[in-house]
Amino acid sequence: MDIEVIHEPEDLMVVAKVSGETVGRLHYRESVPGTWTMYSTVVEPAMEGNGIGSRLTATAVAEARRRGKDINPTCWFVSDWLAKEREAS
């Protein structure tokens, strides 16, 4: 399965697509200047278990860091992903 993950800054989200169809989304907002609040990660039920949520999160986190933003993870999935990343490093 070929999963394409795209940052869409104009919509404040990262999307995952398979064959051109959106199968997952991570939403964020710049709640205060310099901080991205990542508040929602959604993957279509039929696509769960394929690592899509992790790819969405990795892309959003990398983009935030590249832009020098702090991350405020109010979404439980993003919070768990970041905790695992810290444990691995």
PLM features: what roles do these ranges have?
Residues 1-11:
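Active-site rim helix/loop that mediates acceptor-substrate recognition in acyltransferases
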Residues 12-23:
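Conserved beta-hairpin
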Residues 16-18, 30, 40-41:
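Residue-level recognition of conserved beta-strand positions in structured domain cores
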Residues 30-38, 70-72:
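A conserved beta-turn-beta hairpin within the catalytic core of GNAT-like acetyltransferases
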Residues 41-48:
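A short, internal acetyl-CoA/4′-phosphopantetheine-binding micro-motif in the GNAT/acyltransferase core
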Residues 49-62:
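Conserved acetyl-CoA-binding loop-helix of GNAT-fold acetyltransferases
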Residues 63-76:
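Conserved GNAT acetyl-CoA-binding A-motif
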